[in-house]
UniProtKB/Swiss-Prot annotation:
A motif (Tryptophan repeat motif) lies at residues 1012-1028. InterPro entries: Aspartic_peptidase_AS (IPR001969), DNA/RNA_pol_sf (IPR043502), Gag_p24_C (IPR045345), Integrase-like_N (IPR017856), Integrase_C_dom_sf_retrovir (IPR036862), Integrase_C_retrovir (IPR001037), Integrase_cat-core (IPR001584), Integrase_Zn-bd_dom_N (IPR003308). It comes from Simian immunodeficiency virus (isolate TAN1). Residues 113-125, 135-151 have a biased composition (Polar residues). The record marks 155-156, 389-390, 463-464, 515-516, 614-615, 1054-1055, 1174-1175 as: Cleavage. Gag-Pol polyprotein and Gag polyprotein may regulate their own translation, by the binding genomic RNA in the 5'-UTR. At low concentration, Gag-Pol and Gag would promote translation, whereas at high concentration, the polyproteins encapsidate genomic RNA and then shut off translation. A lipid is attached at residue 2 (N-myristoyl glycine). This is Gag-Pol polyprotein. GO terms for cellular component: host cell; host cell cytoplasm; host cell nucleus; host cell plasma membrane; membrane; viral nucleocapsid. The active site is at residue 540. A motif (Nuclear export signal) lies at residues 16-22. Its cofactor is Mg(2+).
Length: 1462
């Protein structure tokens, strides 16, 4: 500081301090402005020593002047300061900054004109650069014009003594400064002026060197390269190459690539830059620099995307910090200067917090930034809060506050507040609307603030702080200092009883002194003696130093500035001062200065031995209960061996000592058996409890985590740590009311003593509720830590924790230490034994490395004799390995254990299974690794066909780096084809990807677009088709045959049919052709469906290459329309083989027994002596009904008594309903009072749809707009018509609005939200939206307006289409559900009433009364009773119903004395 401040001395310093910062302003230049200017020059890699003389100042001015127009406010302020300093050195008399800047700009203009008029030869003879010679004539360093006084050459092109221009490589210091700028600033707006300053006079070669120095920013450099290429191409278009020879003495004109330094040499660049333009000179360095700045502007917009509209002052943010952020962002805004000026004038005030906004508005229009900063200094931050607090304290204790410099105001009443700003009573300075009072709030004088005021509090000043603190004199409780004690467990070494500052003393017991133990329900104030002076002080563990006010200490002191509550505070630092607290005295460093309250900091607290004691935070107990009507388990303990009894006794002693179990007496009637097993590879025992009976009786729980996290979903992190929570379940408390049900007994040897009984106080191992409760508790414990560190990955599964971050090693370890301490405060220990901080990390069965992951080592079993259990374990390990090992198969191995077999039953390995196992072993020999997920790259999934119905797939982002692999061998049905299998596999991969990454990958499928489209058109029951593309990876999927949609005119038509007798199982299949041919075949032990298939087989066998087949069997149509290429049925397999040999096939259906030509003939042919033929009526009426209402086939079959095949054919013949047939899935049943609601769009209008989940009943209407108000109206209408207890919607803004919340609250409706586009959520209403639109399309031509068509479609869906459970319409099903629900509730009430009665009864042959039995139902003529496990029906005349009043003594009364009911 001294070196920089010494640039001016004597008269020059006086002149400097007499110059005003602004014209007509009061503030003047001080030495601190020189210090600031020197620091700024060093930031821009310029030598601060240049400020010592006029020549150096002029060089700085020339360097900064090009950046003034586009530079930041800091650059402009630095330029102005150097201009003033130049004038002081040059002896120019100026009054303020503006005059100095005008003088400098005038000299710059003169020098520029002289430079233009002077010839190149004259400049060389002078041997100097005119640019670097100050106009004042005080020249220096004439031989090397670009050399700084310190001797370093910052500018690349220099002129030697002979006047020859040569290149000086750019200095390492300049490159280092540029790299530091990028590392510290990134690509924010400050980079551009810094680059401009560092690259002044540089050649393209040097500019490329600067870009190469930051080449690790690949994305930014690529964008910069694109901008440079565009500008180079534009240069080439504007400056085409000249044809013909080059003129003598002229340089060639550079191309765009030459300017960028790609195709030009360094010598050419120097010549272009130093040669006059008349001789072909081109400033290639400046041009290239301009191109780079254009690219940097683009990078600033990309890397600093924050809009100026988003910059708002926080409630506690200092105004100066807010202004810094505001101007930093506005520099990055791509707008004209008038627009930026308007933004500054408007948004700077508009986005300030309320405290500052009141003050800024009071300043009026046109206030300068300096006035704003002055007025808002100390407002809004912690210092302002401290002032308000002190103001309130002063108002409460002092009689009044005198803010006026003149007369006194009347004393304030108790509880009144007085403003520090305006002096009025009734409000505080924070809420004062008067203009911010300038000057000091203590002495009233202007020119300084209160923190800099040297005047002490007196009668004429402001009584800002109280002389006596309100808590002085309040004596804290004195307790004996806590004796050091060992804590059982893993040494979580802090005491656990109190929360506060505990101050024990050291020394022997006889010298132990008493110090207070302070709880934090009040401020920890104590009486302190500082060098014999008594005062009150606050114990502050957050303060580094101890600070006192209004005390006078003896001894030497040094000045110091510290950051205090009110900003920076000047203090005096005294060393080795005696400080006494209680009866203990220490010597420490003490600071004396202006502080609101005396503070004892850590430097003294540490010497006193004070500690902060945190109690273990109580974990919230989850309430648990048994299932309704059940009692706890009462299972007797089975016998145990002597060594097991001894082992269990020792284990339970330890658990009881740790408080995890507690002893119970005989009053607890419940018991669960226990036993012990030895741990693997050790002689220690492990206690196990058989909670099977308790699990049956305990309420059900919902697993919060549906699966384990997968490493493929992890992001690549610099630092990773894996932790394990020790004794996880034993760290979570069990519901005290439920503990009695966990009681168990340790028996004694030979029953020499009663068994020892215990019950669990924590979650027991093996109990069904432990996993769910532990997951829930662990999540609540980790939530605050997750919110505090959002950039850190924390994966939690049961007691395993994965923590990944991009911090450096030291910061990451601090983070892990903080997490472990956080868990420890809740009583959760993370033992060092399972603490992993170095790779490889063993986690969840995986092995994690910094750049890859794999599964842990897999060892396949190789027993001498294979059993079912061995095969099961083998398949499980292979399935686990298949997630990263590509090509694993298990189909043949799974065939070995088909059926119901015992675990120990031997299995003979088939040749195919042995071959499959050997292939898998070869795959596992080579180590395979997986990659980590990168959110910036797209996700792809490649699928390969392995044959025999087995498939394999890989999910990856980069070729050769698989995230995950897998296999698939699920067959969707008996008759299938490869495309149906492919659709199932795509569905599986899609679900996996949504779970792991939250997105669906792009699929690479081994099927051509024509094949897929052909099958998709005919077989439409694919619920979801992803984005995909064809890859030519054999073997490809293909359709081996295709069914035509139109008959083949030249081909023979075969009418086929089959018949079978249900009783004799005899049948016949045959066909009749349109050319007079016919044939039949008798069948044994067959069915109607098999006979129909045999008829098709006969027709295919006897037909040519092209054939038309007509059948009346819907079963045959269903099998063959799916285009199967494989089947488990022999007859279907034969048909498939024959179909593949045909060139063209047409398959059609006609209704049976309707007198249709060929069908009637073949029906008679195959039915003779086999079955009777029936004829139907009502088909025409059903056809008319469907044309009007488009009912589904079940409604037609019910209403008109038609067979399903006929009703389905009526649907198939309708052009509007045969678009995509009937879905193959059925109705899903849910709770009776749940509705799903969604909004869909049609014809540019909004349709809101509500679906009753259990019945499929729809309420829908067209609403004017998709808002919360309209949605709330619809929900209230729905609740007024039907019982609605719960609605399920997506997260749309209309459903999350306040209006919908209010409507649900008023109607007592529980509102749940789903996930948009997730197949596991909103499925019912999404499906109904689709169906409703199809119905609207069918009836749209019958209605003029869409709202009418919607109502018609709702009516058709609810009352004209049957199906699902009960074969009802949706309306009938809803009424049935509601009626049944009401009847069930009434019945339950009656059952509860009769449960309090007991029944005595007699059998028919036994006159002895039996009972009491439990009454289940009382009817008119009989009663239903339960005795033991038997349920009986007894006539009323043989039963007596007794109300149970409790146990009665034997002999106290007979049957006649008891109350009965007959």
């Amino acid at each position: 500081m001294g070196a920089r401040a010494s640039v001016l001395r004597g008269d020059k310093l006086d002149t400097w301090e007499s110059i005003r910062l602004k014209s007509r302003g009061r503030k003047k230049y001080l030495i601190k402005h020189l210090v600031w200017a020197g620091s700024e020059l060093q930031r821009f890699a310029m030598n601060p020593g240049l400020m010592e003389n006029v020549e150096g100042c002029w060089k700085i001015i020339l360097q900064l002047q090009p950046s003034v127009d586009i530079g930041s406010p800091e650059i402009i302020s630095l330029f102005n300061t150097i201009c003033v300093l130049y004038c002081v050195h040059a002896g120019e008399r100026v009054q303020d900054t503006e005059e100095a800047v005008k003088i400098v700009k005038m000299k710059l203009t003169v020098q520029k004109n002289n430079s233009t008029a002077t010839s190149s030869g004259q400049r060389q003879n002078a041997g100097e650069k005119e640019e670097t010679v100050p106009p004042s004539g005080n020249t220096g360093n004439t031989g090397r014009a670009t050399e700084t006084p310190s001797g370093s050459r910052l500018y690349p092109v220099i002129t030697d003594a002979q006047g020859v221009a040569r290149h000086q490589p750019i200095s390492p210091r300049t490159l280092n400064a540029w790299v530091r700028v990028i590392e510290e600033k990134g690509f924010n707006p400050e980079v551009i002026p810094m680059f401009s300053a560092l690259s002044e006079g540089a050649t393209p070669y040097d500019l490329n060197s600067m870009l190469n120095a930051v080449g690790e920013h690949q994305a930014a450099m690529q964008m910069l390269k694109e901008v440079i290429n565009e500008e180079a191409a534009e240069w080439d278009r504007a400056h085409p190459a000249h044809a013909g020879p080059q003129q003598a003495g002229m340089l060639r004109e550079p191309t765009g690539a030459d300017i960028a330094g790609t195709t030009s040499t360094l010598q050419e660049q120097v010549l272009w830059m130093t040669t006059p333009q008349a001789q072909g000179g081109v400033p290639v360095g400046d041009i290239y620099k301009r191109w780079i700045i254009l690219g940097l502007n683009k990078l600033v917009r990309m890397y600093s995307p924050v809009s100026i509209l988003d910059i708002k002052q926080g409630p506690k943010e200092p105004f100066r910090d807010y202004v810094d952020r505001f101007y930093k962002t506005i520099r990055a805004e791509q707008a004209s200067q008038p627009v930026k000026t308007w933004m500054t004038e408007t948004l700077l005030v508009q986005n300030a917090n309320p405290d500052c906004k009141h003050i800024l508005k009071a300043l009026g229009q046109g206030a300068t930034l300096e006035e704003m900063l002055t007025a808002c200094q100390g407002v809004g931050g912690p210092s302002h809060k401290a002032k308000i607090l002190a103001e309130a304290m002063a108002s409460a204790t002092a009689g009044g506050v005198n803010m006026l410099q003149g007369g006194k105001r009347p004393p304030l009443k108790k509880g009144q507040l007085q403003c520090f700003n305006c002096g009025k009573v009734g409000h505080t300075a924070r809420n004062c609307r008067a203009p911010r009072k300038k000057g000091c709030w203590r002495c009233g004088q202007e020119g300084h603030q209160m923190k800099d005021c040297t005047t002490r509090n007196n009668s004429t000043g402001v009584n800002f702080f109280r002389e006596t603190h309100p808590l002085v004199g309040v004596q804290t409780r004195e307790l004996c200092a806590e004796h050091p004690r060992e804590r059982e467990g893993s040494g979580a070494g802090d005491s656990t009883d109190t929360s506060g500052a505990n101050c024990p003393t050291t020394g022997d017991d006889d010298e132990r002194r008493v110090l207070p133990q302070v709880n934090l329900w009040q401020r920890p104030m104590m009486t302190v003696k500082v060098q014999g002076q008594v005062c009150q002080a606050l114990l502050d563990t957050g303060a580094d130093d101890s600070v006192f006010c209004n005390i006078k200490l003896k001894g030497q002191w040094t000045p110091k500035t510290i950051g205090g509550i009110g900003g920076f505070v000047p203090v005096s630092e005294y060393y080795n001062i005696p400080v006494q607290i209680g009866n203990k005295e220490v010597r420490a460093t003490v600071l004396v200065g202006e502080t609101p309250i005396n503070i004892i900091g850590r430097n003294i607290l540490k010497q006193l031995g004070c500690t902060l004691n945190f109690p273990i935070s109580p974990i919230e107990v989850v309430k648990v209960q048994l299932k309704e009507g059940m009692d706890g388990p009462k299972v007797k303990q089975w016998p145990l061996s002597k060594e097991k009894i001894e082992a269990l006794t020792e284990i339970c002693k330890t658990l009881e000592k740790e408080g995890k179990i507690s002893a119970v007496g005989p009053e607890n009637p419940y018991n669960t058996p226990i036993f012990a097993i030895k741990k693997k590879d050790t002689s220690k025992w492990r206690k196990l409890v058989d909670f099977r009976e308790l699990n049956k009786r305990t309420q059900d729980f919902w697993e919060l985590q549906l699966g384990i996290p997968h490493p493929a979903g992890l992001r690549k992190r610099n630092m990773v740590t894996v932790l394990d929570v020790g004794d996880a379940y034993f760290s979570i408390p069990l519901d005290p009311d439920f503990r009695k049900y966990t009681a168990f007994t340790i028996p004694s040897l030979n029953n020499n003593t009663p068994g020892k009984r215990f019950q669990y106080n924590v979650l027991p191992q093996g109990w069904k509720g432990s996993p769910a409760i532990f997951q829930s508790s662990m999540t609540k414990i980790l939530d605050p830590f997750r919110k505090e560190h959002p950039d850190v990955d924390i994966y939690q599964y049961m007691d395993d924790l994965y923590i990944g971050s991009d911090l450096n090693e030291e910061e990451h370890r601090k983070l892990i230490k903080k997490l472990r301490q956080h868990l420890l405060t809740w009583g959760l220990e993370t033992p060092d034994k399972k603490y992993q901080e170095k790779p490889p990390f063993m986690w969840m069965g995986y092995e994690l490395h910094p750049n890859k992951w794999t599964v842990q080592n897999i060892t396949l079993p190789e027993p001498e004799q294979w059993t079912v259990n061995h095969i099961q374990k083998l398949v499980g390990k292979l399935n686990w390995a298949s997630q990263i090992y590509h090509g694993i198969k298990t189909k043949e191995l799974c065939k070995l254990i088909r059926g119901v077999k015992g675990l120990t039953e031997p299995v003979e390995m088939t040749r195919e299974a042995e071959l499959e196992l050997e292939e898998n072993k070869q795959i596992l020999k080579e180590k395979v690794q997986g990659a980590y997920y990168d959110p910036k790259l797209p996700l792809q999934a490649a699928i390969q066909k392995q044959g025999q119905g087995q498939w394999t797939y890989q999910i990856y982002q980069e070729e050769g780096k698989n995230l995950k692999t897998g296999k698939y061998a699920k067959s969707p049905g008996t008759h299938t084809n490869e495309i149906r299998q492919l659709a199932g596999l795509i569905q599986k991969i899609g679900n996996e990807s949504i779970i792991i990454w939250g997105i669906v990958p792009k699929f690479l499928l081994p099927v051509s677009k024509e094949t897929w489209s052909q099958w998709w058109t005919d077989y439409w029951q694919v619920t979801w088709v992803p984005e995909w593309e064809f890859i030519n990876t054999p073997p490809l999927i293909r359709l081996w045959y295709n069914l035509l949609s139109d008959p083949i005119p030249e081909a023979e038509t075969f009418y086929v049919d089959g018949a079978a007798n249900r009783d004799s199982k005899k049948g016949r299949a045959g066909y009749v052709t349109n050319r007079g041919r016919y044939r039949s075949k008798d069948l044994e032990n067959t069915t109607n469906q098999q006979a129909e298939l045999w008829a098709v087989d006969l027709a295919l066998k006897d037909s040519g290459a092209q054939v038309n087949i007509v059948t009346d069997s819907q079963y045959v149509m269903g099998v063959l329309q799916g285009l199967p290429d494989q089947s488990d049925s022999p007859i279907v397999e034969q048909i498939i083989q024959k179909l593949t040999q045909k060139t063209a096939i047409y398959l059609a259906w006609v209704p049976a027994h309707k007198g249709i030509g060929g069908n009637e003939e073949v029906d008679k042919l195959v039915s003779k002596n086999i079955r009777k033929i029936l004829f139907l009526d009502g088909i025409n009426e059903a056809q008319e009904d469907h044309d009007k209402y488009h009912s589904n086939w079940k409604a037609l079959a019910d209403e008109y008594n038609l067979p399903p095949v006929v009703a389905k054919e009526i649907i198939a013949q309708c052009p509007k309903c045969h678009i995509k047939g009937e879905a193959i899935h059925g109705q899903v049943d849910y709770s009776p009072e749940i509705w799903q609601i969604d909004c869909t769009h049609l014809e540019g209008k909004v349709i809101i749809v509500a679906v009753h989940v259990a019945s499929g009943f729809i309420e829908a209407e067209v609403i004017p707009e998709e808002t919360g108000r309209e949605t709330a109206y619809f929900i209230l209408k729905l609740a007024g018509r039907w019982p609605v207890k719960k609605i399920h919607t997506d997260n749309g803004p209309n459903f999350t609005s306040t209006a919908v919340k209010a409507a649900c609250w008023w109607a007592q409706i529980q509102h749940e939200f789903g996930i948009p586009y997730n197949p596991q959520s909103q499925g019912v209403v999404e499906s109904m939206n689709k169906q409703l639109k199809q119905i609207i399309e069918q009836v749209r031509d019958q209605a003029e307006q869409l709202r009418t068509a919607v109502i018609m479609a709702v009516y058709i869906h609810n009352f004209k289409r049957k199906g699902g459970i009960g074969e009802y319409t949706a309306g009938e099903r809803l009424l049935d559900i509601l009626t049944t629900n009401i009847q069930t509730k009434q019945l339950q009430k009656q059952i509860l009433k009769v449960q309090n009665f007991r029944v005595y009864y007699r059998d028919a042959r036994d006159p002895i009364w039996k009972g009491p039995a439990r009454l289940l139902w009382k009817g008119e003529g009989a009663v239903v009773i339960k005795e033991g496990e038997d349920i009986k029906v007894v006539p009323r005349r043989k039963a007596k119903i007794i109300k149970e009043y409790g146990k009665q003594m034997a002999g106290a009364g007979g049957m006649d004395d008891r109350q009965n009911e007959t």
